[in-house]
Each structure stands twice: as structure tokens, then as C-alpha cells.
UniProtKB/Swiss-Prot annotation:
<feature type="compositionally biased region" description="Basic and acidic residues">
    <location>
        <begin position="258"/>
        <end position="279"/>
    </location>
</feature>
<feature type="modified residue" description="Omega-N-methylarginine">
    <location>
        <position position="121"/>
    </location>
</feature>
<keyword id="KW-0175">Coiled coil</keyword>
<feature type="modified residue" description="Phosphoserine">
    <location>
        <position position="202"/>
    </location>
</feature>
<feature type="modified residue" description="Phosphoserine">
    <location>
        <position position="521"/>
    </location>
</feature>
<feature type="modified residue" description="Asymmetric dimethylarginine">
    <location>
        <position position="131"/>
    </location>
</feature>
<feature type="modified residue" description="Asymmetric dimethylarginine">
    <location>
        <position position="135"/>
    </location>
</feature>
<feature type="compositionally biased region" description="Basic and acidic residues">
    <location>
        <begin position="227"/>
        <end position="241"/>
    </location>
</feature>
<feature type="modified residue" description="Phosphoserine">
    <location>
        <position position="248"/>
    </location>
</feature>
<feature type="modified residue" description="Omega-N-methylarginine">
    <location>
        <position position="128"/>
    </location>
</feature>
<feature type="compositionally biased region" description="Basic and acidic residues">
    <location>
        <begin position="311"/>
        <end position="320"/>
    </location>
</feature>
<feature type="modified residue" description="Omega-N-methylarginine">
    <location>
        <position position="130"/>
    </location>
</feature>
<feature type="compositionally biased region" description="Basic and acidic residues">
    <location>
        <begin position="59"/>
        <end position="72"/>
    </location>
</feature>
<feature type="modified residue" description="Phosphoserine">
    <location>
        <position position="137"/>
    </location>
</feature>
<feature type="modified residue" description="Phosphoserine">
    <location>
        <position position="255"/>
    </location>
</feature>
<keyword id="KW-0488">Methylation</keyword>
<feature type="compositionally biased region" description="Pro residues">
    <location>
        <begin position="396"/>
        <end position="406"/>
    </location>
</feature>
Length: 531
């Protein structure tokens, strides 16, 4: 009984071993199939120049190695169906049953020793018979298993071969499609498979192959190629090209998709329309600019041009303080300002002169104009300068009045006086007007009394005579008045001298070519000037 149990246990062990072997064989076949598919896909990727994990050198050697490895891996799969043969084979399969039989005989002898009554039941023949049956049963089961496994393996091999052929056909179609696409031939999309990768569809890259042999770390599909120097230089050239080109819109749209390009063009048109409307708002109906600082702008500045450097100046032109001073424009502006200031001073100075008493101021202005037309420099110099000191410095002598004389000629003197008047225009304006109004009545009577016997030989202007002040040219009374008489028409009536004599005296005692108004107080010069 123990021998039968041992033989059954041996048969069960053989069956378990067969099952394990079959499971291992199937697992190996599955692994081999997967490995072969991966290797085939890797080969295709290498042919197209997209394989990242493949080594960069010796690709022909690698192909041979892959073929050898695939053959080596196929070897176990071809032998694997015969793995269950040794237990059931007649040639080399006798040793396990014999060993099992010997083990069974040993166990039977031990059982004899334990139970001598069972010895005649177990005999050599019986043991051999069971051993023979043990040999026969594994042989039959092994034959069936081998036939089934062989059939399955053949089916698997056939399917794998068909799959590989299909994959090769699909990859060939994809490669042909990509090749035609590069050459410009349009064909329908190729058949897709589970290993299809859109990054592989540009075919092999000879340049990337060469760069990879040079140990380049960048992939051939990257922007600019494997050479990083070309990437950097390409960026610089692209920027310079965008600056130098007619517009950057064409360059920008090259890297856009169709949808992005359409959106960008629509946005660009809207912005251009808004800009044109804004420019129209800044123009008058006649086409001129509404603002003065826009007069120098041209239509070319508002188009997409290669010179963005000038944009900040026009952008900040709206602010007056940031406007760059241009010499011609700035000079014209100053001349206009001077003209306006002089005309304003003329209007202010002419207000008190409209009355009867202060005829001297208007007379001086008239004489300034007449002398200027006659080109005589002598009477011009003292008339605007000498009365300037009179409102504030009453006791000053006539020779001291022209002491600060201008060294340059008349034109420069006029400019200097104009500048001083602009600087100190409204300092003494109110004071002088008040003094003029207060002393109007005091001046009228003495002026008429003293001017009748006095002589005005040549320096008296015709305008004074036209106003009705009589002058006798035969009676010169200038010498006794020069040292002691006050120089101002605003002095008290007792020591007052007429304006005509005072001007005459100033003309005679002052140098004709010198004309110093710079030393005068700045606020005293304005009422007597015509410029």
C-alpha cells in the first residue's frame, strides 16, 4: 500500500513539474514576444533617427547584436516544448523513473522491515509493474502536452510573424507618407498602429546622425538643431531680421498655427483701426495737427517700421518739459516772446504818457524811433537810461547818470536792456505809475514857465515842439544848471528843471558811444524803453 502511495505521489510530482514547466514556457514565450516587439520598434525608431535610448555609435554592430539576441531568445522557446519530454521520453527519461523506482523500492523495503506480513504482497515484479506503469503514464501525458504546446507555439509564432509583417507594412507606409510630405506630395494619411508616434514622422535625419556621432547632447528634433551655438546665433539673427524687416507681423506668423494666425491678424486689424481713429482725432478737418508739438510728426512714424527708438520722444512729446530744445524752433519762440514782452511794455508805458503832464516819456519814445530811423546813436543812449534813476535816486547829478555806460554798440545795448526789462519787468511798475500820477500837476506849470526862456539848440526832438512847448534856440542855459540842479523831473518845484533842459544836458555831458544801463537798478529801466 505504501508503494502504491509512493508511486502515486511520484506521478503527481511529475504532473506538477510538467505544469510548472509549461507555465514557465508560456511566460518565457510572452516575454520573448514582448522583447521582440520592443526590439523591432527600436529598430524602426533608429532607422528614422528618433531613438533616444540607443547608443550613438556603431549602429550596424547593434543591429547584428539585436539579431543574435533575438535568435538566442528564440532558442529557448523552440526547446521549451521539449522540456516535458525527459520524464516521458524513452531515451533519456529512464533515469527519473528508475530513481523514483529505487526510491520506491527503498521505501518498500523499509515498510517490509516495519511490517513483515506484507512482504509477499510487495514483490519485484509488482514493483516493476507499477514502475512500468509509472513510466508509461508520464510518457503518454508528456506526449499529449508536447503536441499541444508545439501546436500553440507554432500558432504564436505565426501570429507574431504576421504582426511583425503588418507592423513593417504600416511603418513603411508612414515613412513613405512622411517622405512625400517633405517632398511636397500630398497623400492620404497612413494607417496608424499602437506604436505610432507623431514625433517620428519626419524620417531619418542625416545631420542629426552626424551630430550624434560628434557626441552632441542636443537632439536633432530640437529647435536650432543639435548645435547650441547655432541656436544662439539663430535667435540673434531672427531678432535682427525682425528689426530690419518691413514689419514683425510676417515673422511672428511663421511660428503660429492657423487659428493663432487668424486671431493675431484680427487683433492687428482692430488695433490699426483704433490707432487710425486716434490719429484722426488729433488732426483738424484740414489735415493739420491740433497740437503744436505734433507738427514735426510724419505719417511714416505711425506705421510698423524698423525704428522703434524714436517712439519714446514722440510718446513723451505730450509733456512740454520733455520736449527737446531744437535751436531754430527755440530761437523763433524766444524772438516771439521778446516781441510780445516789448509790446506789452509799450502798452504799459504808454498809459501814463497819454496825459498832458508826462510828455517827456512819450517824447523819449518818439525820439528813439526817429533817431533809430536816422541812424544817429548819440541821443538814443541817455534817454532810456537817465530817467531810470530819477524815481529812486533824486539827488543824483547828470554826469553820474550815464557813468555806468554800455561798452558794446547800440544793438547790443538794446538787447541787454530788453533782457533786463524782461527780468525785472513788474518790480517798479506800480511805484513809477503812482509817482507819475502824483507829480503830474507839479510838473505841468514849472515846465511851461521855464521852457519859454530856455534854448533847445539841437538835442530837443521835434515831438516836444509839436506838443506846444516853446523853445528859444538862442538862449543856452545849460552850463549853470549842470553842477547844482537836480537830475530828476520829480524833484520839488523850487529846484525843478524842465525835462527838455535835463535831456539836453544829459546829451551834452554824456559820451555818445557809451551806454551803460547794466549798473542801474533793474526796476528803473522799463518805463523809458521802447524795446
Amino acid at each position: 500500500m505504501a508503494a502504491t502511495l509512493d508511486l502515486k505521489s511520484k506521478e503527481e510530482k511529475d504532473a506538477e513539474l510538467d505544469k510548472r514547466i509549461e507555465a514557465l514556457r508560456r511566460k518565457n514565450e510572452a516575454l520573448i514576444r514582448r522583447y521582440q516587439e520592443i526590439e523591432e520598434d527600436r529598430k524602426k525608431a533608429e532607422l528614422e533617427g528618433v531613438a533616444v535610448t540607443a547608443p550613438r555609435k556603431g549602429r550596424s554592430v547593434e543591429k547584428e547584436n539585436v539579431a543574435v539576441e533575438s535568435e538566442k531568445n528564440l532558442g529557448p522557446s523552440r526547446r521549451s516544448p521539449g522540456t516535458p519530454r525527459p520524464p516521458g521520453a524513452s531515451k533519456g527519461g529512464r533515469t527519473p523513473p528508475q530513481q523514483g523506482g529505487r526510491a520506491g523500492m527503498g521505501r518498500a523495503s523499509r515498510s517490509w522491515e516495519g511490517s513483515p506480513g506484507e512482504q509477499p504482497r510487495g514483490g519485484g515484479a509488482g514493483g516493476r509493474g507499477r514502475r512500468g506503469r509509472g513510466r508509461g503514464s508520464p510518457h503518454l501525458s508528456g506526449a499529449g502536452d508536447t503536441s499541444i504546446s508545439d501546436r500553440k507555439s507554432k500558432e504564436w509564432e505565426e501570429r507574431r510573424r504576421q504582426n511583425i509583417e503588418k507592423m513593417n507594412e504600416e511603418m513603411e507606409k508612414i515613412a513613405e507618407y512622411e517622405r512625400n510630405q517633405r517632398e511636397g506630395v500630398l497623400e492620404p494619411n497612413p494607417v496608424r498602429n499602437f506604436l505610432d508616434d507623431p514625433r517620428r514622422r519626419s524620417g531619418p535625419l542625416e545631420e542629426s546622425e552626424r551630430d550624434r556621432r560628434e557626441e552632441s547632447r542636443r537632439h536633432g528634433r530640437n529647435w536650432g538643431g543639435p548645435d547650441f551655438e547655432r541656436v544662439r546665433c539663430g535667435l540673434e539673427h531672427e531678432r535682427q531680421g525682425r528689426r530690419a524687416g518691413l514689419g514683425s507681423a510676417g515673422d511672428m506668423t511663421l511660428s503660429m498655427t492657423g487659428r493663432e494666425r487668424s486671431e493675431y491678424l484680427r487683433w492687428k486689424q482692430e488695433r490699426e483701426k483704433i490707432d487710425q481713429e486716434r490719429l484722426q482725432r488729433h488732426r483738424k478737418p484740414t489735415g493739420q495737427w491740433r497740437r503744436e508739438w505734433d507738427a514735426e510728426k510724419t505719417d511714416g512714424m505711425f506705421k510698423d517700421g524698423p525704428v522703434p527708438a524714436h517712439e519714446p520722444s514722440h510718446r513723451y512729446d505730450d509733456q512740454a518739459w520733455a520736449r527737446p530744445p531744437k535751436p531754430p524752433t527755440f530761437g523763433e519762440f524766444l524772438s516771439q516772446h521778446k516781441a510780445e514782452a516789448s509790446s506789452r511794455r509799450r502798452r504799459k508805458s504808454s498809459r501814463p504818457q497819454a496825459k498832458a503832464a508826462p510828455r517827456a516819456y512819450s517824447d523819449h519814445d518818439d525820439r528813439w524811433e526817429t533817431k533809430e530811423g536816422a541812424a544817429s546813436p548819440a541821443p538814443e543812449t541817455p534817454q532810456p537810461t537817465s530817467p531810470e534813476t530819477s524815481p529812486k535816486e533824486t539827488p543824483m547829478q547828470p554826469p553820474e547818470i550815464p557813468a555806468p555806460a554800455h561798452r558794446p554798440p547800440e544793438d547790443e545795448g538794446e538787447e541787454n536792456e530788453g533782457e533786463e526789462d524782461e527780468e525785472w519787468e513788474d518790480i517798479s511798475e506800480d511805484e513809477e505809475e503812482e509817482e507819475i500820477e502824483v507829480e503830474e500837476g507839479d510838473e505841468e506849470e514849472p515846465a511851461q514857465d521855464h521852457q519859454a526862456p530856455e534854448a533847445a539848440p539841437t538835442g530837443i526832438p521835434c515831438s516836444e515842439q509839436a506838443h506846444g512847448v516853446p523853445f528859444s534856440p538862442e538862449e543856452p542855459l545849460l552850463e549853470p544848471q549842470a553842477p547844482g540842479t537836480p537830475s530828476s523831473p520829480f524833484s520839488p518845484p523850487s529846484g525843478h528843471q524842465p525835462v527838455s533842459d535835463w535831456g539836453e544836458e544829459v546829451e551834452l555831458n554824456s559820451p555818445r558811444t557809451t551806454h551803460l544801463a547794466g549798473a542801474l537798478s533793474p526796476g528803473e529801466a522799463w518805463p523809458f524803453e521802447s524795446v
